[in-house]
């Protein structure tokens, strides 16, 4: 039986009770994607992007939860941790449900990154490969079977997704820093 008070389930309940059919995973992916693309952490800009995905202006309770989610993401991306926590169903949810949420998270991330990335031609080969991986992962949600191998594959992909955003964030953060002035050789 799924744990009803998981962060994912709590957010899903909040969204559903407010009339939003968007997955918490897709919303979290959107937030991380836009943050990793260099959109910054302006709450109003995040709420505008979220409202577009939600297809309506969020009510105060959803709005407050979205701001809290952004604060969590900000502390993860700017802190000392080397992974982020993904807003996904608990491990006791069926694998098909978790895999679908993983795909939705990737789709949200790619949307957020794509809408906010200033110049993708400046990304390293490694960063470009991460984005390609995310696109591929977003398509494989039906390929995982309820089995030990399927579970192992899911966990491997999830662990990858916990570190991949940090690479993209550090890369776009570097692009925002102007090059240091070269000392003159007089």
Swiss-Prot record:
Origin superkingdom: Bacteria
InterPro entries for this protein: YgfB-like, YgfB-like_sf
GO cellular component: cytosol
HAMAP family linked: UPF0149
The family this protein is said to belong to: Belongs to the UPF0149 family.
Protein name, entry field: UPF0149 protein Pfl01_5435
